[in-house]
Amino acid sequence: MRRNIFCLACLWIVQACLSLDRADILYNIRQTSRPDVIPTQRDRPVAVSVSLKFINILEVNEITNEVDVVFWQQTTWSDRTLAWNSSHSPDQVSVPISSLWVPDLAAYNAISKPEVLTPQLARVVSDGEVLYMPSIRQRFSCDVSGVDTESGATCRIKIGSWTHHSREISVDPTTENSDDSEYFSQYSRFEILDVTQKKNSVTYSCCPEAYEDVEVSLNFRKKGRSEIL
């Protein structure tokens, strides 16, 4: 009997030592994370998935070919240095992005800085997977001709790493089946017809390496007056 009690006590002590609460996990992440160092593994690029979920189209200027858009930018990647044993601990935590390495993604045809509208927190899972999905307002330069027609206009937005070539960061569109207008405001003066995403690999005159980007094509048109009253 005493032996069984002793074994149970030892097991409880081991589990207590192995278990981590959220404060422990956050402390460990802050201690091990290196925000300035890209987390490549064995010379393989960091695989980054990105997609845009459009929330609203606020303004379209057909004279200057500019569009003002609000969207969620869903970005995922893996950083194995952040992983922990979740057997007796939470399997995910929210972490300020200032404590993490974050891909230096930029929209190549943006004409304003991204205005982040939500708390700058990322979800980190126990296997090291990171999801960052801020709500962003930003202006882009793109062809908006035809926005008043039935077929609408198609604005193309290119997003890729600003400094890392394809041997350091591999960028791919998120593969998922969802309604393109699922999150889009019903009160917008515009409506989404279609959204497509594709991957590009481009070599620029400045550099010998290829750079990857995700090209998001937003097909939209202005609603009829009767539809927005």
From Swiss-Prot:
Changes after translation: N-glycosylated.
PROSITE patterns (UniProt xref): IG_LIKE
PANTHER family on file: NEUROTRANSMITTER GATED ION CHANNEL
Protein's cellular compartments: Synaptic cleft
Assembly: Homopentamer.
Keywords: Disulfide bond, Glycoprotein, Immunoglobulin domain, Receptor, Secreted, Signal, Synapse
Tissue specificity statement from the Swiss-Prot or TrEMBL entry: Expressed by glial cells.
Segments forming domain Ig-like: 114-217
Protein name: Acetylcholine-binding protein
CDD domains per record: LGIC_AChBP (cd18995)
Family of the protein in this entry: To the extracellular portion of ligand-gated ionic channels family.
Signal peptide (residue range): 1-19
